[in-house]
Amino acid sequence: MDLGHSLFVVFTCFLMARCRTEIGKNITVVVMLPDNHLKYSFAFPRVFPAIRMAHDDIQKKGKLLRGYTINLLNHSTESQGAGCSESQAQIMAVDTKLYEKPDAFFGPGCVYSVASVGRFVNHWKLPLITAWAPAFGFDSKEEYRTIVRTGLSTTKLGEFAHYLHSHFNWTTRAFMLFHDLKVDDRPYYFISEGVFLVLRRENITVEAVPYDDQKNSDYREMISSLKSNGRIVYICGPLDTFLEFMRIFQNEGLPPEDYAIFYLDMFAKSILDKDYKPWESSDINWTDPIKLFKSVFVITAKEPDNPEYKAFQRELHARAKQEFSVQLEPSLEDIIAGCFYDGFMLYAQALNETLAEGGSQNDGINITQKMQNRRFWGVTGLVSTDKNNDRDIDFNLWAMTNHKTGQYGIVAYYNGTNKEIVWSETEKIQWPKGSPPLDNPPCVFSMDEPFCNEDQLPVLGIVAVGSGLALIIFGISSFLIYRKLKLEKELAGMLWRIRWEELQFESPNKYHKCAGSRLTISQRGSSYGSLITAHGKYQLFAKTGYFKGNLVAIKHVNKKRIELTRQVLFELKHMRDVQFNHLTRFIGACIDPPNICIVTEYCPRGSLQDILENESINLDWMFRYSLINDIVKGMNFLHNSYIGSHGNLKSSNCVVDSRFVLKITDYGLASFRSSCENEDSHALYAKKLWTAPELLIYDRHPPQGTQKGDVYSFGIILQEIALRNGPFYVDGMDLSPKEIVQKVRNGQKPYFRPTTDTSCHSEELSILMEGCWAEDPADRPDFSYIKIFVMKLNKEGSTSILNNLLSRMEQYANNLENLVEERTQAYLEEKRKAENLLYQILPHSVAEQLKRGETVQAEAFDSVTIYFSDIVGFTSMSAESTPLQVVTLLNDLYTCFDAIIDNFDVYKVETIGDAYMVVSDSQSRNGKLHAREIAGMSLALLEQVKTFKIRHRPNDQLRLRIGIHTGPVCAGVVGLKMPRYCLFGDTVNTASRMESNGEALKIHLSSATKEVLDEFGYFDLQLRGDVEMKGKGKMRTYWLLGEKTDVYVI
């Protein structure tokens, strides 16, 4: 009984543990929103499809929360007929927490509902993500520490207003008018709240006046208050009330040119829905609307213009119709749904990191901390959060840009990430008075200043003021004239000019044997980069020289002469003025025909392309991000300088100096640039791999390029650094540069771009690449954005400059150590091969003497045995065969012979045609064994030749004839080129005669050899008799038949 009870308890515990494990794989997300989509831009029909889209993307792609299932629950926070309900939101939050155990909340949207639920989730330590709730109060993280806002924040709007005031020098006062019914969600109150509080925080006096159109607010009283309190006006309320205010403003006769009126219209209903003319939405009979609205500006949220947002918008509307039967029209309100989508992705990323670190899925404190100071690309563009978990929002500033038609255009936008206003280069504010109005004009709000008295200034005062003004005008004029004269003097002085005679091409101190450095040069003439020719890529020595004792890089210009126009002089002056750590320093230019060249700073480490293509250099990601950061810094400075753009940015134009700092070269001096490639040359297309699509349509695009074109080129360089597979690498496709350029130029969707591989680099880097090489130049980020983005990616790069430099030096030293070790091993291997070759050419003892540098002396030997052989009938066989067949025959035969003689103590002296000569005891001094070794070798060769097959004549038998003789010789090395080990003496001649007087397939030997072999007693010899030898007379000779099998050999 006890055993059964124990088993039951164990089984129950197992089931409970298993159930708890399965539950842990589920993530429950509660979405709480109102239902009325006509009233709320964050209602269920608008937002829930976006959240479901994010949910589906996460579950399908599997990159985030792999193995987890996300369950979405939805609850309404709206009371029937009453709009947003704070109590309903509280009840739904508590019930959900008790019965459904959620891991996160999304919504509710309404400010008061978010505030009440936010206090609960703060206590439960669960995250609450919303894309609305703009109230200033949520900045308090002591009370709302787990709230994350991925949409509009009134604080961010206030910061934009503050930057506007700083730009226009409005530092004293402002006036605010906002609509407030004090019921429901009070959207206009909370939107204007941030502007009021931020300006007040900056010591600007702000008079705020609420109004309620349902209580017949007196607009004339508002106008009276406005006249007494401000000239910089902010109005936040329904469009019809704003236009009514402007009608009264006009009727009261206020001069609009003295005011700057900003209408806070977050969703641009006054602009986008009204043909870009705000006043056309009402039936008001305007006297002169264009004159009136010249001083009216509209501040809206900035609509994302990336392709992902457009696709998201289309799918959002389709899902709203399918799931809620609601027909949505495209509007700026869709950005709220997009921000909820990005908020869901932000939560998924933070949760994924928490789980990967072993954390809990309901640890809201840790999860929300991971959402702080984060940056990634979402459907609404760059998503950047601050330390308060509020998203950095961008805003547009609209103004009347066409004073004839009255149409509005965007004159600036506020970059919330960079905290700066970016002014349009084409659309400008046209102030009625030519300059912004004053926020605190003299003698209007205060009469305390002395000059506000109606009495006229005394004569002395008038004289003093006039004299002062005259002195100021004289001083300004003198300064301008001085600057003009100084500029002309600099242009005429030509401080940049270098005479050809001043350049030296040998070291003044003769320290270096050559002035070249192992860099690469481009076909266009750059001192750096890989030389790409029609036949491939080659590394050459860059042209370098010495100027005033310093080593410099010299780039020759393919022009007959340079016309020194004023434009060229200004280009040269600007080049001389540019000084930055990440740009190569311009030293000067030589314009003496035909030696026209540009002289720049010399960087000894080579180009970035060289480093990437050198597989022996190991680049970790800290080093790579450091190189990327150097490029971004250099290009950001260049784009903000007089030069403006590069026009030919590529990896070969990024060079590394001795301190491993990357610098950009070959910029500026557009007048010096020329092209010498043939129109259809391989090099021309290879050079265009970095060129943006919009510039490829030109046969010769502007030499100075464009800033957006430089961003595209930077994207290609990013891919080079990330994959190290060369420029414009496309996985699985082997295309020529011409084919690649033509595909990019065609511009057909899907756009042809290089391969990204998130297994080799981060997903954020892939997003940055794709953003940089976007087809539409307007979609590409500026280098100011890229700089911040890269700094965010390069978390390790936040260390000091010294630590970064030391890290680079350490990595380079490690690379050098590995390279030295590899080169040493390669050297030893080549040395071994050379020694083996030497041992094959010369005897071992002679080779050792030569290696030691000793002179090889001729040497006499008392007794050696020499072997000669040739092939009987070889001449006729050669006549009947092709030369290639003869070579093949001899190679096969001698390869076979060489393998056999390795088994004997012999040395092959030479082969001449079919003749084969071998000697024994010329170096080893093996007593009388030399005769035995040659005899044994001869028998082995004769046996092998009987089975040898001729490839082209397989039925023919090779007939080998062998001759052997023993006697004294003299040996030595003859010659310096191709030295040969030669034997001299009558023994050599006699051995040759023994072979020539022998018979096929027999071994013919002399009596001298026979006497030595008899001492061994196991060779079978047969007397041939006396044979007449040329020059020798008659000699008694013998046949070697084989070895005796019945004799025991010791």
From Swiss-Prot:
The membrane topology of this protein is: Single-pass type I membrane protein
Keywords of this entry: Cell membrane, cGMP biosynthesis, Disulfide bond, Glycoprotein, GTP-binding, Lyase, Membrane, Nucleotide-binding, Osteogenesis, Phosphoprotein, Receptor, Signal, Stress response, Transmembrane, Transmembrane helix
Reactions that this protein is recorded to catalyse: GTP = 3',5'-cyclic GMP + diphosphate
Task: List where the protein spans the membrane.
Answer: 461-481
* Positions of the Guanylate cyclase domain: 865-995
Indicate whether Transmembrane helix appears among the record's keywords: yes
- Carbohydrate-modified residues: N26, N74, N169, N203, N285, N352, N366, N415
The SS bond pairs are: C84-C110, C236-C339
* Record bears the keyword Ligase: no
The post-translation modification note in this UniProt entry reads: Phosphorylated. Phosphorylation of the protein kinase-like domain is required for full activation by CNP.
The listed locations are:
Cell membrane
Q: Which InterPro entries match?
A: A/G_cyclase, A/G_cyclase_CS, ANF_lig-bd_rcpt, ANPR/GUC, Cyclic_nucleotide_synthase, Kinase-like_dom_sf, Nucleotide_cyclase, Peripla_BP_I
| UniProt-listed GO biological process terms | intracellular signal transduction; ossification; receptor guanylyl cyclase signaling pathway
EC numbers for this chain: 4.6.1.2
Cytoplasmic compartment residues? 482-1050
Where in this chain does the record put each Protein kinase domain?
517-790
Q: Which residues lie on this side of the membrane: Extracellular?
A: 20-460
Q: What class of enzyme is it?
A: lyase
PANTHER family according to UniProt: GUANYLATE CYCLASE (PTHR11920:SF505), GUANYLYL CYCLASE (PTHR11920)
Sum up the protein's function in the record's words.
Answer: Receptor for the C-type natriuretic peptide NPPC/CNP hormone. Has guanylate cyclase activity upon binding of its ligand. May play a role in the regulation of skeletal growth.
The Swiss-Prot or TrEMBL record describes its family as follows: Belongs to the adenylyl cyclase class-4/guanylyl cyclase family.
Protein name per its UniProtKB record:
Atrial natriuretic peptide receptor 2
